[in-house]
Amino acid sequence: ETLTITILNRKGLEAAHFFCGCDMFRSLQKFSGEIINADGQSVRKIKKSELQKSEYSSSLSTDDYFYFYECNYPSLPFTVKYEWEVKCNNGLIGYPPFIPLADFNQGVEKATYRIELPAGQGCRYRELNTQGKGIQVKESTGANGQQVIKATASKLSPIIKEPFGPDFTELFPRVYFAPSAFKYDKSEGDMSNW
């Protein structure tokens, strides 16, 4: 995955932080980051060894943990770019969702999501809150018969949080993806429909 975000003022600093949740089924394999100043010059490279790991959980027993990096570059505006790879172990019941707007008061210039599956493996998806928001999902077939799904969003205006207003789930556009046939831990099944 790749995330590039430009921070324009102090209110947006939290959006520059990196977070990746892991557990016995998901692990962070690769990571790199880069901070770019207002002049477009790379001022800092971030390595996986600089990530902090936390195993804090409100549950009594869990194997969940997460990696995070707090990006606190002092000069605004700046851009931060993260690239990472997550490995799924013991099967998969869902792919990461496409959520181009991550928080209130953030706009999106361009967001893309692409999933490519080998021939014979199906993927289903469900769009929520995408009507009239400039989000498109297109399916195609690759040269070797693979299923390709691409979701795009461009020029999304920020959603302003209103006191006592609707929740994130009612406002923000997103697309969920899941394999039609799955294997998870020691279970197998078919979820061809929702």
Residue ranges of model-derived segments:
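Secretory-pathway-linked proteins and extracytosolic
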Residues: 87-97, 101-194
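Lumenal/extracellular ectodomains and adaptor appendage modules
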Residues: 1-114, 150, 181-185, 193
